[in-house]
Curated annotation (Swiss-Prot):
GO terms for molecular function: dihydroorotase activity; zinc ion binding. Catalyzes the reversible cyclization of carbamoyl aspartate to dihydroorotate. It comes from the Bacteria. The gene is pyrC. Keywords: Hydrolase, Metal-binding, Pyrimidine biosynthesis, Zinc. InterPro entries: Amidohydro-rel, DHOdimr, Dihydroorotase_CS, Metal_Hydrolase. SUPFAM superfamilies: Metallo-dependent hydrolases. Pfam families: Amidohydro_1 (PF01979). This is Dihydroorotase. It comes from Acaryochloris marina (strain MBIC 11017).
Amino acid sequence: MQKLTLTRPDDWHLHLRDGDALKAVLPHSARQFARAIVMPNLKPPVRTVADAADYRNRILAALPVGQTFEPLMTLYLTDNTSPEEISAAKASKFVKAVKYYPAGATTNSDFGVTDIRKCDRIFAAMEQEDIPLLLHGEVTDTNIDVFDREKVFIETHLIPLVSRFPKLRVVLEHITTSEAVTFVLNTNENIGATITPQHLLFSRNAIFKGGIRPHYYCLPILKREKHRQALLQAATSGNPKFFLGTDSAPHARNSKEQSCGCAGCYSALHAMELYAEAFESANALDKLEAFASFYGPDFYQLPRNTKTITLAKQTWQIPDEVPFPGTGLVPLRAGEEITWKIMDG
């Protein structure tokens, strides 16, 4: 049996939710990942260091006995975030980044920034304190085609932003286009990007294969095959600017399977197995460890993990559903076979 032992990975973009939903999904991430950058888009959002401390405590309290996991907290950037809050975040040691959502761009983003140019004083404070800015890189202008929103964001907002704040550490999260890859490659080392398993494995055809498939719908939306190929090449290139971030986003089945369903793919259950399949498809399994375990902590200036996980070449069937409050949770590629399996973690 072929086996692959890796330094224990981290997830640099994760949605854990709260309450009973948190308790349902946290064990899946903790089984594979030592740490995760936890998204702040709760209701209400995590806007202050005090909010982040409370949420962190709830995450740790929900962790099952015998599992270890370190939540790395983030603040939700709003039009009203203050430079003083940025200083408090740096002093806290447990807040590791600030997240930018354009208002209305994705789940629970109603409190997001209405005009990114209004946040320059915050970006200046973040540059001064050396706190990374995490970007949901899409415009929300309804006149812009949904498949072009990332490209237009880069052209309209991101290029000017990094020009104004050249020392600001920036992560362009869940990149989906060749334009995003090109942008990251042509910027300084303080600019990085996360890539999800779904964007490495699927093009937008997956959403419409034989009908509408809501469990492949996420934001930013899956793109053309040429973009998937560009992402796969970037992820497997050995370039440290690209690292793992699942954007695993749990929604109950009835929230996805309806006339106006939520955006988000749930991959925390089997994330490393999905990434292994993607890297194997590019004959690049030797590049998986650095992508999953080294480049993220290096970017965040944190130590690499010392423990390991082992994946084996073993076929198993992804469950149709996993327990979750309400109507259950459908994982990405539910009911299908996958060819890698975590043996310990």
